[in-house]
Amino acid sequence: MRLALFTDTFLPQTNGVSLTLQRLTTHLNRRGIEHLLFSPKSAPEDSYADPIRPITSIPFFLYPECRLALPNMSSIQSELTAFRPDLLHLATPFNIGLCGLRYARKLGLPHVTSYHTHFDRYLEYYRMKKIVPLYWKYMKWFHRSCDATFAPSYETLDSLQAQGFQRLKLWSRGIDCNLYTPKKRSHQVRERYGITAPLLLLYVGRIAPEKDINVLALAMQQLPESIQAQVHWLVVGDGPLLSEMRVQAPQNVTFTGYKHGEELAQLYASADLFVFPSSTETFGNVVLEAMASGLPVLTVNEGGVKDLVTPGRTGMIVAPRSPDAFIREISACIAYPQKLAAMGHEGRQLALGRSWESIFDGLIRDYEEIIENKRFDLIPALLPLV
């Protein structure tokens, strides 16, 4: 089996899509599956090893962290003709994904898509709600011809089904429980950041409107004084609202910037509660990372995160976009530290059952089934030629 993957976001960009695809390519290498990956080139001096095929790109004006690819269709077509893929996976619906779609449709090749981001909800945060109907019209066109559309959670699958999408399949997400583990809890984290408060609250993610970061900021500012003295916040990440949030944050908030690998895993394990207000997630990778690290999770009952957290067992779920709801739960946590530990333990047990290996092997089986079904579909068309 030979696969061609198309994505408009990849490393060194840090987001759920790029990290998932990086893990997928690693798994394909382990399984000996030939593949190419077409992705944006972040800088002219960057070098890329096989199987990555970098495409010239420029910063996206609305979100400079993201890249807008400027693909050469002729060059991509030459690469694909030489490679002869059995299936194309279009991970994003933008310029690079469109190149894959054009090639697949032109040659009648098996192709699948994956839905990673609720862009319709993002548009509302950037005062572009009026174009949501146009967005859905485009998305339905993009996904219409594919042999399967993969969604990362049942919540996302249901929302796509409600929009009329067909041939939907679940492609969930896994977690590296050796990297993210409670064993990495370290007092050095508190020493490094000068933390003396008994309860360490953690947020990991982009500092951006679509993450409902204003809810987090208001909860930080409006916690009662008696509670403020007992908690410290670590905010891990970067984004367009970071400067504004720094100015508004109380003194018990530390901003670390982006963290990766072992350093990030240590931050997770050394916190006491993961606080995540985003209502726009299709899955919520950081929530699963927190659970694997033995952290209880305080999040909202909207988006893919609600499929991960069981209230009272692995964390707490509150109404979205409500700073008061977050404040109430954080205040209650102060009195019941043992309950937090118990929920963190149960979250760890859930995460242990979600290995990337089993999830990617399931995806590969889906690929193989789609390729085989496509071959059978061609038989009736070829019979008159026999």
Predicted regions and their residues:
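Conserved donor-binding/catalytic core segment of Leloir-type glycosyltransferases
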Residues: 195-221
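Short alpha-helical donor nucleotide-sugar binding micro-motif in glycosyltransferases
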Residues: 80, 258-259, 266-271, 363
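Conserved acidic donor-binding segment of nucleotide-sugar-dependent glycosyltransferases
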Residues: 310-312, 316-323, 332-338, 352
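Short hydrophobic beta-strand element within catalytic cores of glycosyltransferases
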Residues: 296-299, 309
